[in-house]
């Protein structure tokens, strides 16, 4: 699913809202999540998951074409940890324990 499809689905579920308003809301939510992560904050959507950033330290890497050793600089990367409800919905029955 891409962002425009998400906007269409949300707009269809909420016919009282204009398509443009739904698009603005989706963009605002994504902008707020992005701004929070850029500030180093964690964003938790209970039941769905949590977004955070993790530091990847600098290291020595290798160019796959030439085999030449290269220096890879330190960087921050986004990380997503799934929430319990999302995991359970993706894997129904996995958390159920049966007594025999």
Swiss-Prot record:
Q: Which GO terms describe its biological process?
A: DNA recombination; regulation of DNA-templated transcription; regulation of translation
InterPro entries found in the cross-reference section = Hist_DNA-bd, Histone-like_DNA-bd_CS, IHF-like_DNA-bd_dom_sf, IHF_beta
Might you report a single GO cellular component term?
chromosome
Its keywords, alphabetically, are:
DNA recombination, DNA-binding, Transcription, Transcription regulation, Translation regulation
Molecular function per GO: DNA binding; structural constituent of chromatin
Matching Pfam families: Bac_DNA_binding
| PROSITE patterns on file | HISTONE_LIKE (PS00045)
Keyword DNA-binding attached: yes
Q: How does it assemble?
A: Heterodimer of an alpha and a beta chain.
UniProt family annotation: Belongs to the bacterial histone-like protein family.
Q: What does this protein do?
A: This protein is one of the two subunits of integration host factor, a specific DNA-binding protein that functions in genetic recombination as well as in transcriptional and translational control.
What name does UniProt use for this protein?
Integration host factor subunit beta
């Amino acid at each position: 699913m891409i962002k425009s499809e998400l906007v269409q689905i949300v707009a269809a579920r909420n016919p009282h809202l204009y398509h443009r308003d739904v698009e603005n809301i989706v963009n605002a939510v994504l902008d707020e999540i992005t701004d929070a992560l850029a500030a180093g904050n964690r964003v938790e959507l209970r039941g769905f998951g949590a977004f955070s950033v993790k530091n990847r330290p600098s290291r020595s890497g290798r160019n796959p074409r030439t085999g030449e050793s290269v220096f890879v600089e330190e960087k921050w990367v986004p990380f997503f940890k799934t929430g319990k409800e999302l995991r359970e919905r993706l894997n129904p029955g996995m958390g159920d324990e049966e007594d025999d």
